[in-house]
Amino acid sequence: MRPQSLRQSGRTTAVRRGCPCDLHFVTRRSLGVRRGRSVKELVEVPLSYDEALDKVTGPGQLFEVVGTEVDGHPVRVFKNAPANLGALFAGARGDEAEFIVYEAERWTFAETMRNVDALASALVTTYGIRKGDRVGIAMRNLPEWIVSFAAVLSIGAVSVSLNAWWTEAELDYAIEDSGLALLIADPERVERAHAPAHSRGIPIIMVRGDQLDPNPTGVRRYDEVVNLGDPMPVVEVDPDDDATILYTSGTTGFPKGAVSTHRAVVNGLMAFWCSSTIQTARKGEDLMGGGGFAPCFILIVPLFHVTGCVPVMLSCFGMKFKLVMMHRWNPDTALRLIESERVTAFVGVPTQSWDMLESPSFSKYDTSSLATIGGGGAPAPTKLVDRVEKGFTRGRPNIGYGMTETNAFGPGHSGDDYVTHPTSTGRARTSIMDIEIRDESGKPVPTGTRGEIWMRGPNVIRCYWNKPEATAETIVDGWLASGDLGRIDDEGFLYIEDRAKDMVLRAGENVYCAEVESAIYEHPDVYEAAVFGVPNERLGEEVACVVLRQPGSDLDADGLRDFLSKSLAPFKVPSRIAFADDQLPRNASGKILKRKLREVYFDEGS
């Protein structure tokens, strides 16, 4: 059943009311001007990036930045940031403007918050969820994902986002590792996660559960639990209380739970809004809307990923923007929705921009409402930047360099800067983050010199859940070691050139080679294996491997993929497989030379 009191059709319009968390007029307020004046009118001459940054974050502005300490380390934070995410959600209560569009359903902000309040009440009164308890969310992109997330955080519990692609074994690990008190899931994830949850006595709330009848033991349907009209429980939530755990692939073969506080998520979110305001102040380019169109995002990436959750979903929640949700990716469906809903912002991975441009139906749809076509989570070919710039009527290319560990925020690129510096990921100087390039000993290197990228800011995670050693290796004196190698040029642009971590970035999904290699070695016919990434114009990178078989084995690529599909999510299974005749090449210390294997087996002509 769907949640109660849903609008199945029709549109709702409403006057947007201001509140401490309503940043709909963020650009004008941040520059300290009347609501009736535009940024273009305010800025008589173009501003440099540094001038705009200083102006937007200066004293008295909405995005004023001040110094403070977090865990004993100095950071810059937004002075006017909400104290917690519950305060941000509360700003939507009673607002009858349209929020979520999902297939035939249209949810207002007020309807969403009625469900949030009622679910939060049920979590506390029916399930005994208390501040600090972990509640898992395992489902595809559905309105109930957003409701569940907001309800959990509003009562001071911790939202644990579980990857909807995961197998039962992968879900089992995360359920055990996070110590869930409750799981909220859709029917497909209930079937996959029921055994791991039930064996530990963890109850499940199932959304849209018409497909499962009767309910499995320990599972109750959403409509049986939620009573619309129940009030939001009152819980004191501090900025430094834990808010979210998002799992990111682990170098040891197990995913790591990245723990963010309310302060981290809120400041990361406001940093995105600040960056948009800076761009508008510089050149009058409104990255959220403009052109006579109301701001509207299309959600084309999973909510269990940090990109879908923070810069897309939470931006719409906080800024009172319409959010058009796609249950699964389809380029023609996306184009149809962009035209019919007048979508202004598209944030995904380069694969998805490429898919739309390559669609035979592309020219049939009106995409003139799009102001920005954003990318991230995978390398973007220079060719794609040029195609986006030329292929869309008004939309400008945009890219960001962020991580789960930074709540997706980091140096970003858009418009002219991106077109003129297409191989860069953006300017290293940001509103709240410090960026340094360091050598192997941890010392900063001169401008233009390559080294590991280190980042510091209030948006950085607190720790990896239950992994103190991994935390100590990655976060040092408040600085996050990214595992990426890069350089900063004399203009202040950051370039990502390689990875210190053994990882493949496939269409926004982090795939750690050690995890895949470990699974490959479980096959009895495998003697030796190496996993690495190879370039793919559509995906950014794809997973490849070279395998040396045991003597006499006739194992082939399809057989290996079938074996791996039983233990790995589909995106982790290598799409390119080669078999070696001799032992894999190694250096003097015994490390397999993956770069050489890539050149020999998967060069551009292969």
Please identify what each model-predicted range represents.
Residues 166, 172, 183, 346, ...:
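AMP-binding/adenylate-forming catalytic core of the ANL superfamily
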Residues 77-87, 96-150, 167-172:
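Conserved AMP-binding/adenylate-forming core of the ANL superfamily
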Residues 427-432, 443-474, 509-511:
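Conserved ATP/PPi-binding loop(s) of AMP-dependent carboxylate-activating enzymes
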